[in-house]
Each structure stands twice: as structure tokens, then as C-alpha cells.
């Protein structure tokens, strides 16, 4: 179920989740890799986690 939900995420959100949770990077480090701000990583992460919670709850 989780794998399928991850596949449904927009690409950028999926990248953030992979870097943060699979690779254990900080938001700052993930931001550097993706060439975006730490604030943007935070927003993308929050959105992705909210989507995953919704999808996995149903």
C-alpha cells in the first residue's frame, strides 16, 4: 500500500520523501541536492505526508 501511494505522489514530493526518510538527510541537505530552499523542502514534505496519510487511511 505504501509503495503504491508513494508512486502516486508528484515527482518533487517523492524526491523529498526519498531523501528525507530513505536516505535520512536533513531538510537543508535535501534542499541543496534538489537546488531549492529548505522552506520549500519543508512545504513539499508536509504536503506529501498529508497526502500519504489520507491515501493510507482509506
Task: Tell me the role of every PLM-derived stretch.
Residues 44-47:
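Residues within the DNA-recognition helix of helix-turn-helix
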Residues 10, 23-26:
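A short, glycine-centered helix-capping/turn motif at helix boundaries
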Residues 7, 21-22, 53:
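Short, locally clustered residues in the helix-turn-helix/winged-helix DNA-binding domain
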Residues 16-20:
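A short pre-motif secondary-structure segment
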Residues 26, 36-40:
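Helix-turn-helix DNA-binding motif, specifically the short coil turn and the N-cap/start of the second
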Residues 1-15:
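Amphipathic alpha-helical segment used for protein-protein interaction
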Residues 29-32:
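Short alpha-helical "recognition helix" segments of helix-turn-helix
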Residues 14, 49-58:
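Short, Lys/Arg-enriched C-terminal cap helix and immediately downstream tail that follows
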Amino acid at each position: 500500500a505504501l509503495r503504491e501511494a508513494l508512486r502516486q505522489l508528484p515527482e518533487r514530493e517523492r524526491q523529498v520523501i526519498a531523501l528525507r526518510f530513505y536516505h535520512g538527510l536533513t531538510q537543508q541537505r535535501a534542499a541543496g541536492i534538489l537546488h531549492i530552499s529548505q522552506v520549500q523542502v519543508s512545504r513539499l514534505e508536509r504536503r506529501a505526508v498529508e497526502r500519504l496519510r489520507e491515501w493510507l487511511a482509506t
